Amino acid sequence: MTYRTGTADLKREMERLIRSERHVTSARIARAFGEDGGGAVTCAENLVVAPGLSEEASEALIALVSEGRVFWSPISRTAYHLDGIFLDLPVSYVQRPFDSPTWLPAAFNPPRVHRRVMEAIQLMGGVGLDPEAPDPDRGSHLYGVHTEFECGRCGRCCTLSSPISLEPQDVERISALLEIGIRKTIRKYAALVEVGDHRAWSVKRDSPCTFFDQDRSLCKIHAARPIVCRAFPLLSPRTAGGEPPASWCPSARDL
């Protein structure tokens, strides 16, 4: 069955379907709400939000994800309704426990996906675009700089960084790697961080990070580490506030 409704109704019907089924694949969403074989919208983490969806269906899905109404898994390309776990939480990354949240720069991606990422951010109403950095190519530049970074495994970032922000995609990846449920992952490893009127999930505040293996100086979940860790040292709870990373990260001195 294909739904033929207005924009607001399309969004409402899509959420109703996902809630009733608990999880719905992108292929089924496309069949139900509009297909486009050449369509592909990406989010700001170089992850395909939904291949094969029409523009209208993509807009509705991105809106639901950005509002926290549904949880999108980039691994299984499936939309989940998680009983409001992520409702009312900002999509921006809270990267320091003071002042206002620092947003993830737009398009921290290689150039080949930059254009599609910017289109997705426009559809999301600017979510992920740092209001103090209007240059839309900043993220692409950061990606180029970041490719030159070589970690020295000193462990300082895992010891000094707090809070370590978690987005729904981060939680899903960690859950998949540890082979435990979403709710158990949140209950065991996540905590809410409040900055003024903003709330977001973060790794529970431990020093060093609970996932840091001190004996080997390695991250226990490196393959599924949060985006703020993936983008380190260009993004971190400390560098986001303006502190030069070279002052505490030896490997960042040549960046």
Where are these regions (language model features)?
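Eukaryotic, polar/proline-rich low-complexity intrinsically disordered regions
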Residues: 34, 56, 75-76, 83
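Positively charged, polyanion-binding regions of nucleic-acid-associated proteins
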Residues: 3-27
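Short, positively charged loop/turn segments that connect secondary-structure elements
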Residues: 34-56
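Short loop/turn segments that flank or connect secondary-structure elements
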Residues: 117-255
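Alpha-helix C-caps/helix-loop-beta hinges
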Residues: 21, 67-68
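Short, amphipathic alpha-helical interaction segments positioned at domain boundaries
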Residues: 79-120
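A short acidic, leucine-rich amphipathic alpha-helix
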Residues: 28-30, 64
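Short amphipathic alpha-helical interaction segments
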Residues: 49-66, 72
